């Protein structure tokens, strides 16, 4: 049975991964988060804590779903955003490489400029427009630099358990005859359940 550490297990994707693989005969999930009752506390911004935990667990893989995802709050909490979105992935990368684990890092389309008229592809030029995108890109760069065996997945408009754009639109459509939203954004809603598979 392959052991997989899932960081950020209380987020939309982390919960979807747990639903998908909790009863698997092939994988044993080790769920981590901060401030979540019933799961192992792991502060990915603390390199010593990460190294100790990963060396003890000796996982086959680490799936990093942990992130500071509140885009507006990132603009006000720049240091916290950088620690979680950039240094956290760096720490996980170093630890994964030390124990020979694969690292799957979840990133975002916010690493691109917001002016595309067609869907993005992985080779498009990155040009983040805010703190959230810049810190996620810094995290990607650390993963590339420090993780020997890694995958970076850029997702957008994730929806699943929890707050998200799709649920907000459905709720507003039920209670309002008219819903006003920005019309200058292009995105692809992504099912957390499908991504977890």
Where are these regions (language model features)?
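NAD(P)-cofactor binding segment of oxidoreductase domains
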Residues: 76-104
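Rossmann-fold cofactor-recognition segment
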Residues: 34-48
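Catalytic helix-loop patch of NAD(P)-dependent Rossmann-fold dehydrogenases
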Residues: 83, 87-91, 111-153, 157-158
